[in-house]
Amino acid sequence: MHKLLVLSLVLLGGCTHGPQPTDISGLWINQAAIDSASQGRPLLRAIDAHGLNLEWSIDTRSNKAQVSNAFELGEGQLQPKAPGAWTVDYNGHGTDELQLDDNQLIQQATKNHAAQRFTRPAQPAVAHAQWGMTFRRALNSAYMGGQWKIIEGQGAGNIVVFNADGSVSGLAQNNRYELCLGGDCATQGAGNDTLYLGKGDVGDSWIFVRYGKQLEILQAINQSQPDEIPQLTPGPRKWLLEKQ
C-alpha cells in the first residue's frame, strides 16, 4: 500500500509540472545578417544572403505579428498552428509560417524565399522605438562600432566614432549617419553600399566600400537628370578610415 501511495504521488507531481506554453512575444532580429556583415563584408550582400526580413515584433496576447524589412512594415494575425508553430495571416494577402527551434524563431521557407532565423536582441529594445530600429542599432554597433582612424582625407589622424543610435563624431561637421539597408536607397546606389552623412537635417548620400578593417567613403555622383530618380555612381574618395 505504501508503494502504491508513493507511485500515485509521483504521477500526480508529473501531471502538475508539465511543460508550459511557449511565449514568443517580443522582438526577434536577423542576427545572422549582422554577424555576416560584421566580418567586414559588403553590407547589402550580407543582408541579401540572409533574407529579406530584418525584425519580427510579436504580441501573443493580442495575436498580432509585425515584420519589417528595410523599406516596409507588414502586420498580420498570429494564429497558433501546433505546439511551437504559428501562422501569420496578412488579412488574406498571404501568410508566413513561424516555428520555435530552441532559442531561435524560424520563418519557414516559401516558394519565393529561403528560410530565415531570428534571435532575441542582446540589448533590450529602446522604449517606443520606430519599427526596425532594434535591428538597426544592433547592426550599427556590430558593423560600425569601435574607433576608426582617418588615414586619408579631411581630418587625417582624427578618431571617428559611429554610435549605435546613429550619431557620429570626428568626421568633419557630420553628427548623424544612416546605413542603407535596402529599398529606394539601394536601388539608387545601383548595387553599391551607401550611407547618409549629415548635420541636423542637412546631409548627403555617400557610397562606401568596406573591406575588413578598412572603410572607404566616396562621393556619390548622380548621373540622372533633375526630374529622374537618382542613379549614384562612385566618385573621388573623400575619406579612408581604418578600424583600430
Residue positions per predicted region:
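Sec-dependent N-terminal signal peptides
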Residues: 4-13
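Contiguous, well-ordered beta-strand patches that form the walls/edges
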Residues: 33-42, 48-104, 152-158, 168-243
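Residue-level detector of conserved, well-ordered beta-strand and adjacent loop positions
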Residues: 29, 119, 149, 163, ...
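Surface-exposed interaction/gating patches
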Residues: 133, 137-169
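Short, structured interface segments
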Residues: 105-137
